[in-house]
Structure formats: C-alpha cells, structure tokens
Amino acid sequence: MFLGTKLFPVSFILSPLKTMISFLTYNDTDAPTPFDMAEVGLNPRHVARWIRAVAAEYGYSVGNINYLFCNDEQILAVNRKFLQHDYYTDVITFDYTTAQCLNGDIFISLDTVRSNAEMVSASFDHELLRILIHGVLHLTGQADKTPETKAEMTRKEEEALALIMNYESIVNFKGVSDGVLRIF
C-alpha cells in the first residue's frame, strides 16, 4: 500500500488471518480512503466473489488485494516514481503474491478507464470490470509486454468476464459499501 512516499506491502499492514479485497481512493498525500463501488454502479460483494472465482480458475486463493482508484495525473506520478515510466496507463499492479495466494496493490486510473470505454464503444462498468480482472491476471503471472502475451491477456480477460453468471447483480448496484470486503 502506498503511504506517503514509501511502498508498504499489504501483507505487513493488514491482518494475515483475513482475506480482504479493498476498494480505495488513492490520495498521494494521505492514506487512501474507502471508495464506494456503488458510485460506479458495481456491487462490491459480487465483484469480490467474481475475483475469487477467477483466482481459483488459475489455482490461486485471494489474500489481500487493494484496488486504488486514482486519476490520470496520479497514476502517471506512480508510474514515474516506482517504475521509471513516463506515460499514462490504465492499470499498474504491484505484486506481493506468495505461493498460491494472491496479494497486491492495483492502481486504476478511472480517467483512462472512461476514455478506453469510449474508444472501444464499451460501457464504463464493463471496461472497469475488465481492468479490475486485468490486475488480478497480472498477479497470477500473466504478462502483456509482447503482441502474443497481449493477445493471451485479452483472451483471459474475456474468459474472466464470461464467468460473471448474473451480470445484472454486479452492475447497477444501488447499495452502500464501506469500501472494504472481508472474505473468509
């Protein structure tokens, strides 16, 4: 988890006895705050179940995953500071996976998700789900640096999206979330 100027692995901050998927708003000067998934029309409990199902498809359990939602300028700053890359991106995954247990921080630029959705004529929620699972696929070891691995990543994203049995129960959720899910 990013706090101030240091990178702290989630496993050192959160209780190791609980499985947690957190949805947070990244703030580059303070600690992250809860992000209400309902604001973007997604049911956080169903999204967490889906993430766990996808992880299981690849032989992993879920430990602690933090999704940190930010804007383009914030993700650019993270990209420059920690990866020495000088470009905007939609997602950055910091992998703390141990054995077969997924752990990591996944930064997502909501600005880029919106523009990507418009560019490919997809809904915002569909593109956000694709990016959420893209980060999880990175935690399972999937790369996307070459044309071949990018094509494989896209195929796996589509397979993961197909796992959503009841899409309407995930999208268009009107409930309230504290931004933290504890899955036991």
Put a short name on every predicted segment:
Residues 2-128, 139-184:
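An acidic/histidine-cluster motif and surrounding catalytic segment
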